[in-house]
């Protein structure tokens, strides 16, 4: 059985694969990872205001509570990803400004016990893989790459 997730869901997919041996493959779409550099400053604002507001150009603002940051900052993501012992694919858009493309390589670099850890960067893809652009070319590529990965690893 495979596990996958997008953005924060990608972060959860990594943690799930690290902590549950039932999964035989893991895949992330713009998977969030260890963002402690940003999170400390945002946490301070959340503590002061009751939340930190994250803005996007594709959805309404997201208000993150201090508890979100406390949880996120308490996890050693590299150590967790190092527990993954199954194939891992980190897909990211080259034009993603929410979870920058370099994040995918950080995930793969931490996956030291995975027998097959790969990065796939998609040209022209933003954080939503261009689903709001009216052109589904990137999305079709993403879906096919996902299908191909799970066919190969499940």
Predicted region positions:
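Alpha/beta-hydrolase fold nucleophile elbow
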Residues: 1-5
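Active-site loop->helix "elbow" adjoining a glycine-rich segment at hydrolase catalytic centers
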Residues: 7-10
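Hydrolase active-site cap/lid region
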Residues: 15-64
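Active-site nucleophile elbow and catalytic-triad environment of alpha/beta-hydrolase enzymes
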Residues: 63-80
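Short beta-strand/loop motif that positions the catalytic acidic residue
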Residues: 84, 90-92, 96
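Short alpha-helix in the alpha/beta-hydrolase fold that links the catalytic acid
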Residues: 86, 100-110
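Catalytic histidine neighborhood in serine/cysteine hydrolases
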Residues: 111-128
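Catalytic histidine-centered segment of alpha/beta-hydrolase-like enzymes
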Residues: 125-139
């Amino acid at each position: 059985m495979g596990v996958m997730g997008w953005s924060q869901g990608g972060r959860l997919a990594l943690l799930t694969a690290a902590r549950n041996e039932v999964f035989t493959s893991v895949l992330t779409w713009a998977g969030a990872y260890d963002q402690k550099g940003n999170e400390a400053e945002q946490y301070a604002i959340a503590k002061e205001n009751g939340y930190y507001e994250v803005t996007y150009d594709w959805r309404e603002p997201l208000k993150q509570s201090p508890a979100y940051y406390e949880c996120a900052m308490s996890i050693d993501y590299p150590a967790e990803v190092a527990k993954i012992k199954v194939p891992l694919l980190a897909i990211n858009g080259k034009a993603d400004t929410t979870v920058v493309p370099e994040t995918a390589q950080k995930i793969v670099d931490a996956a030291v016990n995975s027998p097959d850890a790969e990065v796939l960067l998609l040209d022209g893809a933003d954080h939503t893989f261009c689903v709001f652009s009216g052109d589904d070319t990137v999305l079709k590529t993403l879906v096919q790459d996902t299908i191909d990965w799970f066919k190969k690893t499940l």
